[in-house]
């Protein structure tokens, strides 16, 4: 069984969308998949009820029944870095408990997709002793990196990949999320791939979130790699 992380070069690069998309497409292949968000921040109120966007996305678009109680470790109301959001509520994030929860999920599901919060160096405690990257290292799981296509993405993506590779974390591939119509955006993608020859897929900006129902990623080099790993491990 191959479990993995979905991490981003920054916040709001599309990690939740990609996590949900990978979940759905793997489920279509008959794989039992659950997403897991160790820490989520930013409670949303729609006038009737309060919810968290990330885990709500998982449940809404999953093709399989998910265990709501085990989709998330910590949820904090403030839309902020986990360490600060936790501090506002007088809490501390127990990373060992998160790792334990991940391990338990791995015993139940074929694939657990762990979605990161923000970028790799997001702090998880007020002292700055533990970052998301530290948890990824300790989990010993590979990663899929989500990045933008816009100006600035080359630097952000290469820094992220360097941080991962120097810590000997396996990178399964890249997801380029955003517009791809301009020569600059296309060149950004090709330039990054010149530095790191990795499986990848591109996702254009979809008009509606519900478009995820029909969007297929089968045939992309990244998805083919994930499927091959699933087949070889199972």
Curated annotation (Swiss-Prot):
Pathway terms, separated by semicolons: Cofactor biosynthesis; biotin biosynthesis; biotin from 7,8-diaminononanoate: step 1/2
Cofactor: Mg(2+)
Catalysed reaction equations from the record: (7R,8S)-7,8-diammoniononanoate + CO2 + ATP = (4R,5S)-dethiobiotin + ADP + phosphate + 3 H(+)
InterPro entries xref list: DTB_synth_BioD, P-loop_NTPase
List of residues binding Mg(2+): 16, 54, 115
Binding site for ATP: 12-17, 54, 115-118
GO BP, one annotated term: biotin biosynthetic process
MF-aspect GO terms: ATP binding; dethiobiotin synthase activity; magnesium ion binding
Keywords assigned: ATP-binding, Biotin biosynthesis, Cytoplasm, Ligase, Magnesium, Metal-binding, Nucleotide-binding
Family assignment from sequence similarity: Belongs to the dethiobiotin synthetase family.
Subunit structure: Homodimer.
Free-text function comment from the UniProt entry: Catalyzes a mechanistically unusual reaction, the ATP-dependent insertion of CO2 between the N7 and N8 nitrogen atoms of 7,8-diaminopelargonic acid (DAPA, also called 7,8-diammoniononanoate) to form a ureido ring.
Protein name (record): ATP-dependent dethiobiotin synthetase BioD
Taxonomic lineage from the root: Bacteria, Bacillati, Bacillota, Bacilli, Bacillales
Gene: bioD
């Amino acid at each position: 069984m191959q479990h993995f992380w979905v991490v981003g070069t920054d916040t709001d690069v599309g990690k939740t969308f990609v996590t949900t998309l990978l979940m759905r497409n793997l489920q279509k292949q008959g794989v039992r998949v659950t997403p897991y968000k160790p820490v989520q921040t930013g409670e949303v109120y729609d006038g009737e009820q309060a919810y968290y966007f990330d885990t709500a996305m998982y449940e809404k678009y999953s093709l399989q029944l998910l265990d709501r109680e085990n989709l998330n470790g910590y949820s904090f109301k403030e839309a902020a870095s986990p360490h600060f959001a936790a501090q506002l509520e007088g809490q501390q994030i127990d990373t060992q408990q998160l790792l334990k929860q991940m391990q338990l999920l791995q015993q139940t599901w074929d694939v657990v997709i762990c979605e990161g919060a923000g970028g790799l160096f997001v702090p998880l405690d007020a002292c700055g002793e533990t970052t998301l990257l530290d948890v990824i290292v300790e989990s010993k799981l590979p990663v899929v990196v989500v990045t933008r296509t816009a100006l600035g993405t080359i630097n952000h993506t290469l820094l992220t990949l360097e941080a991962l590779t120097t810590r000997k974390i396996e990178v399964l591939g890249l997801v380029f999320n955003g517009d791809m119509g301009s020569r600059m955006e296309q060149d950004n993608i090709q330039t990054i791939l010149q530095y790191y020859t990795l499986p990848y897929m591109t996702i254009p900006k979809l008009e509606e979130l519900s478009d995820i129902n029909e969007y297929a990623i089968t045939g992309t080099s990244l998805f083919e790699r994930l499927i091959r790993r699933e087949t070889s491990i199972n």
